[in-house]
């Protein structure tokens, strides 16, 4: 049996993960990652990151009779997640901080520390499945509960990471997880879920930008698809592709943010139909098998955490980028978001959606 470090948020998913591993005979230790100080300017704690999360995780570990620790990752979280989040918006991109947190904190810093401390594996409460094929290679699959599936956020995991990770609840539905936790008397069985970015729990990232990067909020022109100025914006980081509200353009046909042009400090707007894209480019691709399936292949592509996966052809370009050609157009494909490639329920890999002008 393995010596497993379980990343615990205090919620029902990671709590049950720890319980299941313990019941399977593993040696289990719980850990909560401390990501910032409560009084850090501009940042508010939410369910997944507050001091109450550590207290909840500690109670679960006490009930299970396993050790519990808190690891401090404030500096890493600031550099790799919050600074990245702000930098992306100031460059006209729509960031995905959860993907970066998984990539840099949970599945790099925590895995490295676990190895140093002598743990065989790290487990989390993510809804995804790891399957070892007949060839010995590790595969990443969607969770059984497709509504809770988090494989999109885990596409950056390769063989080195998957070989040392365990996702104990990926084979269960959320309802089953709650029932199993309640049956074991876990205090987190009925704990409310957090739906927001952990450092922006009210959902309004603009307040964070106003505090952390006020110099980036430079007013500029709003232009239509013909290049005519039809209004003024309050700073590009305050807008995202697909946004309609808050443009201040008055009546008439509804207009949406179609593109963001940092070079001209311009916000480009157009009708809803202009949001549809059938082709885009992906940069910095990574692959679960550590190599792409081919230079050109067909698959399903998902461009947002809860978007419908669409059939597409993906082809490598001479500069190393990947051209994605969708079978039918997708609405609001946002530069800066992850595009994740699937073969059925299996994750192949993914990368970051580039701006149209570099496609």
Swiss-Prot record:
Pfam families the UniProt entry points to: tRNA_Me_trans, tRNA_Me_trans_C, tRNA_Me_trans_M
Protein name per the record: tRNA-specific 2-thiouridylase MnmA
EC nos: 2.8.1.13
Database matches in PANTHER family: MITOCHONDRIAL TRNA-SPECIFIC 2-THIOURIDYLASE 1, TRNA 5-METHYLAMINOMETHYL-2-THIOURIDYLATE -METHYLTRANSFERASE
Reactions catalysed according to its record: S-sulfanyl-L-cysteinyl-[protein] + uridine(34) in tRNA + AH2 + ATP = 2-thiouridine(34) in tRNA + L-cysteinyl-[protein] + A + AMP + diphosphate + H(+)
Binding, ATP: 7-14, 33, 125
Active site: 101 (nucleophile), 198 (cysteine persulfide intermediate)
Functional note: Catalyzes the 2-thiolation of uridine at the wobble position (U34) of tRNA, leading to the formation of s(2)U34.
Alphabetical list of CDD domains matching this protein: MnmA_TRMU-like
GO cellular component, as recorded: cytoplasm
Disulfide bonds: 101-198
Annotated positions for site Interaction with tRNA: 126, 337
Species of the source: Chloroflexus aurantiacus (strain ATCC 29366 / DSM 635 / J-10-fl)
UniProt-annotated stretches for the region Interaction with tRNA: 148-150
GO BP term (any one): tRNA wobble position uridine thiolation
Alphabetical list of InterPro entries matching this protein: MnmA-like, MnmA-like_C, MnmA-like_central, MnmA-like_central_sf, Rossmann-like_a/b/a_fold
HAMAP family with a match to the protein in the record: tRNA_thiouridyl_MnmA
Superkingdom, taxonomy of origin: Bacteria
Subcellular location: Cytoplasm
């Amino acid at each position: 049996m393995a010596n497993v470090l379980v990343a615990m948020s205090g919620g029902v998913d990671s709590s049950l993960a720890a319980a299941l591993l313990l019941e399977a005979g593993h040696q289990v230790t719980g850990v909560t990652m401390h990501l910032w100080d409560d009084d850090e300017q501009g940042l508010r704690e939410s369910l997944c990151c507050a001091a109450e999360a550590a207290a909840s995780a500690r109670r679960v570990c006490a009930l299970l009779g396993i050790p519990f620790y808190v690891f401090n990752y404030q500096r890493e979280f600031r550099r790799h997640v919050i600074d990245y989040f702000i930098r992306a918006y100031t460059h006209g991109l729509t960031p995905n901080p959860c993907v970066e947190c998984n990539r840099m904190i949970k599945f790099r810093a925590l895995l490295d520390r676990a190895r140093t401390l002598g743990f065989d594996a790290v487990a989390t409460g993510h809804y995804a499945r790891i399957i070892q094929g007949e060839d010995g290679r590790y595969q990443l699959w969607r969770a059984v509960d497709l509504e809770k599936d988090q494989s999109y956020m885990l596409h950056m995991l390769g063989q080195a990471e998957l070989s040392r990770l365990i996702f104990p609840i990926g084979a269960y539905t959320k309802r089953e997880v709650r029932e199993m936790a309640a049956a074991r008397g876990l205090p987190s069985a009925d704990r409310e879920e957090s739906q927001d970015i952990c450092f922006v729990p009210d959902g309004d990232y603009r307040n964070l930008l106003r505090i952390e990067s006020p110099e980036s909020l430079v007013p500029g022109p709003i232009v239509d698809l013909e290049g005519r100025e039809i209004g003024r914006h309050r700073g590009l980081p305050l807008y995202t592709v697909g946004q309609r509200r808050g443009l201040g353009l008055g009546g008439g046909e509804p207009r949406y943010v179609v593109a963001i042009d940092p070079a001209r400090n311009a916000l480009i707007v157009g009708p809803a139909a202009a949001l549809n894209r059938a082709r885009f480019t992906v940069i910095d691709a990574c692959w679960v098998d550590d190599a792409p399936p081919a230079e050109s292949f067909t698959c399903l592509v998902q461009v947002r955490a809860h978007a419908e996966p669409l059939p597409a052809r993906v082809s490598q370009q001479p500069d190393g980028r990947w051209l994605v050609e969708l079978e039918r157009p997708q609405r609001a494909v946002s530069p800066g978001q992850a595009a994740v490639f699937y073969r059925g329920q299996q994750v192949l890999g993914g990368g970051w959606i580039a701006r149209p002008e570099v496609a």
